[in-house]
Amino acid sequence: MKNCKEITGCDILVAVEPENLFYMTGFWGEAIGILDKDGKTTIIAPELEVGRAKEEGIDCKVIQSDRGMSSLSTLKKFLKGKVCTDCQNYLVMQSLKKLFPKMKNSIEPFNKSREVKDESEIKILKKASKIIDEMFGICQKKIKQGQKESELQSILMSYAVENEMFDTGYRSTLNPLIIAGGPNGAL
């Protein structure tokens, strides 16, 4: 995310999308992430998420805030300079624009920062690949005629959780594992 200034002309990145929040801070949950021009990260989280944000966030300051749109007023206290966000929600972006009329919207700094992998990312990718390969093996052994996809999914999700993978329900994650179509589909 060091290239933010070059890419967007901004000093500060604000992550509201869960994938980018996680990538920026190590925390996956309901929160806003801020990366300032000095490379310091801050998480603004509601009361129920603060403890986990402190536990899971990597080198982050954690600030408690109310949930939802109220968190934007807390955000306003921390932003000085040119700001860029990854916000993909139209209503939230409109609210952000009211508070920060010159705020830019771009996912490019987040995407660019992911292009070059560091040692810890490579280690995580290798572990995830190994677990997914094992899950394909489980499918081959456990799948049988007449079985519902939801039954197979529960076996796979149990294995994934045992191996410290997590199901968030967000796109780009483990859920849904299964297509869930046809007469024996999960739906």
Regions found by a protein language model. Name each.
Residues G33-L35, T41-I44, Q145, L152, ...:
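Solvent-exposed, non-transmembrane amphipathic alpha-helical segments
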Residues M1-G137:
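A composition/biophysics-driven feature that prefers long, compositionally simple stretches
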